[in-house]
From Swiss-Prot:
Any one Gene Ontology cellular component term annotated for this protein: nucleolus
Stated name of the protein: Nucleolar protein 9
SUPFAM superfamilies found in the cross-reference section: ARM repeat
Annotated Pumilio repeat ranges: 91-126, 127-162, 189-224, 288-326, 338-373, 375-411, 515-552, 553-591
Family that this chain belongs to: Belongs to the NOP9 family.
Protein's UniProt keywords contain rRNA processing: yes
Basic residues composition-biased segments: 1-10, 668-678
Source organism per UniProt: Eremothecium gossypii (strain ATCC 10895 / CBS 109.51 / FGSC 9923 / NRRL Y-1056) (Yeast)
Amino acid sequence: MAKQRGRKLLQKQNKDDFKHSLDQERHEEEVIQVPVDKAPAPISADGPNTFFGTLDTQELEYFKRAESTMAVDTFESADEKYQFINSVIEESKGKELKLATSQICSKLMERIILAADDQQLKAIFQGINGFFVNLSYNKYASHVVETLLVRSAALIEKELLTPVFEAELDGDEQVYASMENMFLFMLNELKPHMKMMINHQYASHVFRLLILVLSAKKLPKSTQSNSALRSKKSKIARKMVDLKDNADFDRTYRTPDSFKLELKGILVMLYKQFTNGIEPGTKHSEVNIACVTKFREYCVDKVASPVIQLIIQVEGIFDRDRSFWNLVFSNTEQNDPKEESFMEYLLSDSVGSHFLQAVIGFARTKQVERLYKLYMQDRIVKLAKRDTTGAFVIMSLLQNLGSKEVKSILDDLVPELSILLNSNLDFGSEIIEASIRQGDYKKTEIVEQLGKKYYPADSESKNILESCLQLASSTLGNTKDDWPTADERRRALFLEKLINFDDYFLEIAVESLLNLPEERIMQMCYHGVFSHVVEHVLQAKRVETVKRKLLLNILYKDAVNLACNAYGSHIMDKLWEFTAKLTLYKERIANLLLEEADKVKNSIYGRQVWKNWHLELYVRKRFDWRKKVKEQELEVFPDSKPLQPKQKESIPAKRSAPSNNQRPGSLNKKRNAEKHHT
């Protein structure tokens, strides 16, 4: 008989070797296989790659059902949910590492961590103690560790603000150390591997979160893009998991003093590792050039770069010398050839430009001015035309340089503004913001440049909505329920910024809106992005009364449908103020809503419009509603004077004609009667 071979035989052998059951003996065997204190994680160039085994069929089915139950979250009470979580934690004891490294069950671990109470959280933390390094390097387990760290930060703050000296425990409930001590114990486990974590695909995220917790910085949401924790790509992948953060995310936590000391010690340790033992605070010129070159490679590495950015951001908390900044950049006033070539790479590389853009925001103004004057001052326009690289650095310079340098950059960029906007709308927004910060510097020239681009005087078909928003090629009017694109959102925000910047843009936006067909205007009102532009145009104080009436003549006709729409309802709310001192239009809209009151009240959006328009008052106490309208008019137009009665002129009184209810000749009879009486 031929010798058996292949994957099926290997699977059978593995099954025989690692046969699982649900009894206590199996649990003891698992502990013997990978003991915490006897089997340190094997470290390779790619990090530890420990295999913790797999769950058997029964266990896998149980945890799958538990994950589905947690995802649906249809528990009748908080106590029922607590008991369920407790039972899952009990069943997972001894299997935490298998669960965390499983693609399916790691989601269950995260859900349990997010919903666990303080004792349950500590139990989970204790269960994976000693294996944080291994889990941090795993694709799925690293997310579990991140979620655990955020919840731990919240618990550390809670214990810090409300210390409990004698905890009352129920039954066999285990006594745990404080969360601070458990966290510090975990740090000691991770410290020997931190340099390697910096440029690891998964462990780098854990390390970044550690720095944020230790420095008491804001912990961003797990699905927030371009944050200190996640890239845009990572955010999209995270959203696919269908896990929602709890209230512990997206906020800052107070931390004990020991955390600052730990952070300082970690950064000192890393600096010495990168410089072959040199103490922090050493001048750039005294560090071995090979060490500088190696560290600069980390700065432009797509994985390590965000970590280095974060290190440079937090080092100023306790290091006045900014050792890591001075490791990257020289501190001399002369041009350094090697630094110049490094700067050129940063300004032309996508990862490098994002690194330079970020660290410029963290550095001292003096350090930024040095880089600007030595390597960028003479070629601002050239760098600004590098749409995906240098342009972002120039925008960062506009935000962080001194007034003199910013004005110099504006002098160079404003004449080229219309060209720069062809590929980078964000550049236009940043130039406008810089002009405002410098007291409307170059405002006239900016308005002129933007006017030529989006509303040319010599064009008969000029329309800023078409030229700026590109309505013709947009999703406006699509019947496929297409989502608005990111480009449409960017263009809409830019036009709103222009409208805020100068009245000229509001004026031409209103004119352009009125020049569109009514059907097109209403399509904009129901669009997820362009409705915000229409809403932004409706400014009662800045739009002429005649133009306000023309816009209202179009919008009021579909008031009921607008009120019942997610986007149109915001426009209806804006019309309440936009109709100030135009009471006839206000009452006309109120009557239209009143005629279809049932439809409006049955809509979640319509009910809000009904409330904001005070229509209950309009129905029951019309006089009080009109009084509220008058109060609003005084609030919107405080300088306007109420109509005054005409002053009587000092001229001889003329004989008045008889009133309508007075018969002819009655006045003479009255006079004769008075004379007869006399």
